[in-house]
């Protein structure tokens, strides 16, 4: 594969370290920047990743995919990390439109009974063309505001998933084009909307502390209500506004959003064809309760309609390391309960932390594996 590197650090020499899918170093190249841009060629193998370093400077480690055209190395002043953005050769990234949806029935617990959603359409969008639908449970952080404009005030210091960049590249090379709906989940109801309806004692001890606020003053988890909002309000609204293919949708999420995508997808297999589940908070549930929950999903009974599962897990940082220990058995358990291993793609990166920088490259990598003919 060939891609361009833009060096925004104003450093003439950098080492580019290439890792195998298992994390072993397979190449180490010294790059010399006579100007800020150079072209690099690598032998692409599925799951390879790279990072750049010189002395005390070391960037994040990012997994590569054939969709990547340009990587930009920069220093992020907000989180004080050396980060890597990716760009397209054409400066066109589509458009985001914001809608506010009301639902008195399912969003009864919210003071205003409303949710903001952000709908991204590609740069070549046409009302005459039919599109597949992707729903993301972390809507406030999935699009890069420098490319699609300001659409939310709830930004994260780690930036965005840059989904607009990935899907633009994906749509160029695939028959099926996507539009993307992001659901804003950055307010006080994030945990209660994205976490299964359970008792506080069903969670592991650390999670009980984290989720205690969800149960104050008679409150509870609202995942079932939130799921019904998607099915009964969001989906009909999107179908009325956009020309969608009459096919199943894709759901995407990380952390609590990863847990939501996992359970929403497996509880609604008749609606969902693909699940992207990153750094999932499924590990916050006690093992016995989790096993009981998996059994209720009736995986064996629904073998013919099981969604494709794309599971990512990092291993760096306090939170990500804890989730990694809990999620270590997720794939083996799914297989034990009858999940077709050919429908599960799994990537573990020990150097990846619990943030958008990690998830944007995991998403880019996984979506490059999609086969339109499946």
Across the structure, where does each feature detected by a protein language model lie?
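Non-cytosolic beta-sheet module surface loops
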Residues: 5-9, 42-44, 110
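Short, aromatic- and glycine-rich surface loops/edge beta-strands on solvent-exposed regions
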Residues: 46-55, 73
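Structural motif
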Residues: 3-23
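Non-catalytic cap/lid and distal C-terminal segments of serine-dependent acyl enzymes
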Residues: 50, 86-374
